[in-house]
Amino acid sequence: MACACCCCTASLAQFGKCTPSERWTYTDAKTGNKITVLTDTLKNDRFLYQTDPMWTADGKYLLFRSSSRGDGTMVERTQPNGEKKKWKPTQIYFIEMATGKIIQATEGADLGNAFLANRSNKLFISRNENHQWKLYVMDLDRFFADVEHDKVGKPAKYERLIGIFPAEMGRPGGYAVDCMDDYAYITVEREGTEEEKERMMKNAFLPETNQPIKIKPTLCGIRKMNLQTGEVTKVIDTEFKVGHIQASRFTPGEIVFCNETGGDAHQRMWYCTADGKVFKPLYKETALDWVTHETFATKDYVYFNILGFLPRLRKQANGIYRINLRTDDVEQIGQVEMEKDRCAIDGQLVGRGFWHCNASRDNRWAAGDTFGGNVWMMNVATGERHWLVSDTKMRPDHAHPSFSPDGTKVLFQSGHFTNGKRLNLMMVDITNYK
């Protein structure tokens, strides 16, 4: 009844808007698995990147983002360089897993990134307001209670401003929250010195002649914001573009990030501690390795891919690997059967093998999506492979599989029903797999 009431107030405000469940199921024609579709095919929804938490701490709500569920209003802003930019803002939504109903949790044009707390039902939200990067925290328990009783107030009722990022400490980008929910680790671009810029360009990765340079090298770094006081301090500086920052969900003060080139790199994965005392490569690459899509999956392990999508890359070991953070030992988890995964997908690279990976928190399962548009799961102890899902199209975004915190479900996104034009958010139950 509460959901129906909330739907009636949708015309008054988007924040707190509640819509009925869009959940339905189908049977995968190739694998025979029953797939649960969580969102409507008419929308274009996306999960967060598979490295970031998507479940509230109590496991009752699942977060996603969408630019197609609001009122359709386009926003136009004048940029600092005088250019005008027009776009449809992305907002944050939650699926109540018990009922399937969908709740809008943000509104407005200034949303940056969102990150769920680890220890309580809170949501950290960055916004770019008046050319300032601000970090807020939202009380989700209070918000969901008001949604249930159709008494949602303005966003300010549920949010607290944590801090404003000092401009002199760099230009903020993505961030991750420590497992104790006491610090946010924030990537920045910075000016640096001429000597740093010279070293950066000298050491920059040069791809093969047929590969474009997608992301130019940039002096960057990591800063941390105290989530109680808003104080910002330096962690490290880098002489490469920092991307995919992740904080351990198990051990305080451990950070994994990458040298983001948009493709290959001399050294993709890096590790540091929040006090800046440790800053080192994670898995020292050979010249033939193409490492990508690392995931800080468990207490002691980071999972990653060594790609095999090109003929030259298949002349050596490739697939999903993991590295032990305590010993630096590296183990291969496995690879799909290459010939079975060969597939030409319009608008994508033609290749074979795993593209992204993840692992269950108990180290029992690893999952990966492939260039052929399939989602597989592997038993980490035995190497046994299970084909979960077929034909995700890998567009307009990749499948990006991830596990529910209790390890019973694999979540992914798929363009299967729209021929790659829009995404459905989906999940498959894995409790019957041994």
Where on the chain are the PLM-derived regions?
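Blade-level signature of beta-propeller repeat domains, shared across WD40, Kelch, NHL, RCC1
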Residues: H398-K434
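Conserved beta-propeller blade repeats
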Residues: D45-L63, G108-R127, G163-E189, D237-C258, ...
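Blade/loop signatures of beta-propeller domains
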Residues: Q14-T36, K214-C220
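Multi-bladed beta-propeller domains
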Residues: Y26-R46, K84-K85, Y93-D110, D141-G170, ...
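Blade-loop segments of beta-propeller domains
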Residues: N44, Y49-D52, R69-N128
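Bacterial Sec-dependent N-terminal signal peptides
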Residues: M1-Q14
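Short, conserved, GDST-rich strand-edge loop motifs in beta-rich repeat architectures
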Residues: F15-T19, S66-W87, N128, Y136-L140, ...
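Asp-box/WD-like beta-propeller blade repeats and closely related beta-sheet repeat scaffolds
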Residues: E107-C220, K234-D237
